[in-house]
Amino acid sequence: MNLASQSGEAGAGQLLFANFNQDNTSLAVGSKSGYKFFSLSSVDKLEQIYECTDTEDVCIVERLFSSSLVAIVSLKAPRKLKVCHFKKGTEICNYSYSNTILAVKLNRQRLIVCLEESLYIHNIRDMKVLHTIRETPPNPAGLCALSINNDNCYLAYPGSASIGEVQVFDTINLRAANMIPAHDSPLAALAFDASGTKLATASEKGTVIRVFSIPEGQKLFEFRRGVKRCVSICSLAFSMDGMFLSASSNTETVHIFKLEAVREKPPEEPTTWTGYFGKVLMASTSYLPSQVTEMFNQGRAFATVRLPFCGHKNICSLTTIQKIPRLLVGASDGYLYMYNLDPQEGGECALMRQHRLDGSMETTSEIVDSASHDCPLATQTYGTAAAKGAYVPSSPTRLGKGQDANLEAYTDDLGAVGGACLEDEASALRLDEDSEHPPMILRTD
C-alpha cells in the first residue's frame, strides 16, 4: 500500500508504504527514515524484528515470506530495484528500469516488477528477466496480483483502462492464460487466494466484489458491498484457507464475505399470506432486467468491521493469531488495527488492539477516545508522486559502492539494467538453506 501524497509527502508518522507478507506472518513498513518489519505472532504486542535506516524514503518494501530476502524501492531512485539480504545487511543485486516502479510482487518462483505500461517477470533464483509484458493498458496505480502457489503461479493485471478486464498470465510457462471480463468499470483491486485457483476482483465503482476460478475464469461468487454509494476499494484479501474474503475501502466499514456454496432447499408451500407474497416476488424476478435479478442473487457480508476512522487509505489481512481468526487493518493514519472474527456466527467484529507502526502500543480504550491521529487520506498513488528521473540507457552499468564500483553489471535484452551481484557476498549468503529460501544463484560475471 503506497501512502505518498501527490506532493511526495508521507502519511502520518512519515509513513510511505505498508504491506503484509505472503502468508500474513509479518508486516513491512516503509518510511522517510527507512523500513521496518514487525512480527504478527501476538495481539498484545507488535514486535519489531528488524529496522533499516541506511536507505531513506522507502516507498516499496516487499519481504519474501519469512525469509531474509527483501525487495526495496526508494523515492530517491524510483526506477531502481534493490534486492537485499536484510539479516546480513547486504545487497544481492539491483536493477534499473526505463520508468517509475509502481509495484513489486514476490513468490518462491518469480519476482514481478510493475511499471505503468509494462511488467517484468524475473526468475527469483538468479534474478534474470525471463519475460516482459509490454504495452499494457495505462496502469498508473500499479495494480497487479501474483499467486503465492508454486503450481498455480499466475499473474493478474488490468487488460483495459476503460473497463474491468483482467489479464491472467502463467508466469511459469510464460504465456497468457485467460482474459476475464470481470466488471463494466475499470479495475480497482485484485487478489489471489493461497492456492492460486481463485481471483477476487473489484471495480472503481466498488459496489460488487466477484470471485473467479483460475485459470478458467468462471464466476464462482458475487458479493454486494453496498448499494447506496460508490466507494474506492483499497484492499481485497483471502484467508489462508480460502473460506473468507475481506474488502476494505475509504469508508469506515470493512466487509468480510464467506465463500460457501448456497444449499438449495426443497420448495415449501407457503402457509401464510406473507409467505405466498414472497414466493410470488421471487418468481417475478425472472421477468426483471438482468441487473435487478443479479442483485437478488448476490451474497451479503458475513461479518463487518467498524473502523474508528473514515477516509484513510488502508490494507487488510485475514490471518490466524494465537489460534483465533483475526482481521488486521494497516492504515495511513500510522496504526495497525486488530479485530476478532467469529468464523461461525460472523456479525460485527470486536476491536482487540491498536498498535502504532512505530512500535509503541495503545489499548482499546485509547483507540476509541483518541482522534489526534485522524489525518487526511493520502489519495494519490506513489506513481503520481514520484519524480521521474533520467532515462536509463540499455548499456552495462557499474555499481557505485566504493571498492565494488569496478564490478560490471549486465543488461538484459528485455529492457532491465543491472543484476550484478557482489562476489564477496556470494560466498557469505547461504540462500540454499531452508531458512533462507529460495536458493539463489548469485552471478558474478
Curated annotation (Swiss-Prot):
InterPro entries: PROPPIN, WD40/YVTN_repeat-like_dom_sf, WD40_repeat_dom_sf, WD40_rpt
UniProt feature coiled coil, ranges: none
BP terms from Gene Ontology: autophagosome assembly; cellular response to starvation; protein localization to phagophore assembly site; xenophagy
Positions where Phosphoserine occurs in the chain: 395
GO cellular component: autophagosome; cytosol; phagophore assembly site; phagophore assembly site membrane
Motif (L/FRRG motif): 223-226
Compartments (UniProt record): Preautophagosomal structure membrane
Domain writeup: The L/FRRG motif is required for recruitment to PtdIns3P.
Role summary: Component of the autophagy machinery that controls the major intracellular degradation process by which cytoplasmic materials are packaged into autophagosomes and delivered to lysosomes for degradation. Involved in an early step of the formation of preautophagosomal structures. Binds and is activated by phosphatidylinositol 3-phosphate (PtdIns3P) forming on membranes of the endoplasmic reticulum upon activation of the upstream ULK1 and PI3 kinases. Mediates ER-isolation membranes contacts by interacting with the ULK1:RB1CC1 complex and PtdIns3P.
Family of the protein in this entry: Belongs to the WD repeat PROPPIN family.
SUBUNIT field: Interacts with TECPR1. Interacts with ATG16L1. Interacts with ATG5. Interacts with WIPI1. Interacts with WDR45. May interact with NUDC. Interacts with ULK1 and RB1CC1.
Name of the featured protein: WD repeat domain phosphoinositide-interacting protein 2
Origin species: Mus musculus
Gene: Wipi2
